[in-house]
């Protein structure tokens, strides 16, 4: 839960929160870490499963199943923004269950869901994943790290150095920046 993670930063309960998209949060430093492709998960018998890529316009008129918990609300907002046309809203059903439960239901053709590429490694019977493309190519979602500048935990500094090296990032890290 995004709110719980950010609250944990404020209390010092956690050292870093990695979130999809961006969140305004006073008192925290934010740096972009990496991006992942946005994927649609659907039944292998769905007509769109035959395509290598799916465009946003291909998804109009489909039923989407999303978790009510994060990241469901953010995905819902994305779908409304991308698929709404004058007077017609996308068919989005929010469910009080996990993303994994929703993925396990898709093989029966009950609907589609939208996930980030990092979640597409799990195999579910009769479920396939296809990248979503927009007018500019693959749809990407960015992940950012949030931490308190005054956090003195040496593990945080090591983690930030690892992330910076792993993803060839340019943000500044110094011992004084985390303590």
What name fits each language-model region?
Residues 2-42, 55, 78, 102, ...:
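Short beta-strand-centered segments that line the small-molecule binding cleft or hinge
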Residues 14-20, 95-97, 114-116:
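Short beta-strand and adjacent tight-turn residues that come in two discontinuous sequence segments
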Residues 21-22, 44, 116-119, 143:
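Short secondary-structure boundary segments
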Residues 32, 39-41, 47, 65, ...:
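Residues embedded in well-ordered beta-strands
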Residues 64-86, 153-160, 167-176:
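Secondary-structure junction motif
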Residues 128-173, 178:
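A late-sequence structural motif
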